[in-house]
Design a protein with these regions (language model features):
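Juxtamembrane/disordered regions of integral membrane proteins
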Residues: 1-170
């Protein structure tokens, strides 16, 4: 580890966010490799990236996904029915922005234009990829929920109970 860095120094919400960002980055990198391989005519869900191009697509997918989640962070982690609506919008927007960013890095201009279309085609033909993507982004939503509740608990007012002596009515 790094000197001065211990996982125990961080709160549960921060650790949950870190795990969610790592999982989403890996899932986004994997989906990016699937999409770019399908654009090249290969239909495999599991493969080895042995070229510099494959490695760069992997990195571009991770960067695109993590930065897209960061840009949409205000919509993740809310409670209730409104939180469910926010999460659905965040998942759609995160998917779109991630394809724009990763597509621009992976294949400039071509990837920017056809990235969103290619991801829709990939999700349409491979429901397993869509299910994994939605599962990971639902995990991001849960992690942001833990983080938001943790941050909100810092500012909760501690009201005295009626059993305490100085609170009783005279």
């Amino acid at each position: 580890m790094f000197p001065g860095f211990r996982p125990s120094d961080h709160t549960d919400g921060e650790r949950a966010l870190f795990a969610a960002f790592v999982a989403a980055g890996l899932a986004g990198a994997w989906v990016t490799l699937i999409v770019t391989n399908r654009l090249l005519g290969e239909e495999s869900l599991f493969f080895e990236f042995v070229s510099v191009h494959g490695l760069w697509n992997f990195i571009a997918g991770a960067i695109g996904t993590v930065s897209s989640i960061y840009l949409n962070r205000r919509w993740f982690g809310h409670e209730g029915l409104a939180g469910l609506r926010y999460a659905a919008g965040a998942i759609l927007n995160t998917t779109f922005v991630a394809t724009l960013i990763a597509g621009t890095f992976a294949l400039p201009f071509y990837g920017t234009m056809f990235g969103p279309l290619a991801i829709v085609g990939t999700f349409w033909t491979s429901p397993a990829v869509l299910a994994i993507w939605l599962f990971v982004l639902a995990g991001v939503n849960l992690a942001y929920g833990v983080y938001r509740r943790e941050r909100a608990s810092v500012f909760e007012a501690k009201l005295p109970s009626e059993t305490e002596v100085y609170f009783r009515r005279l």
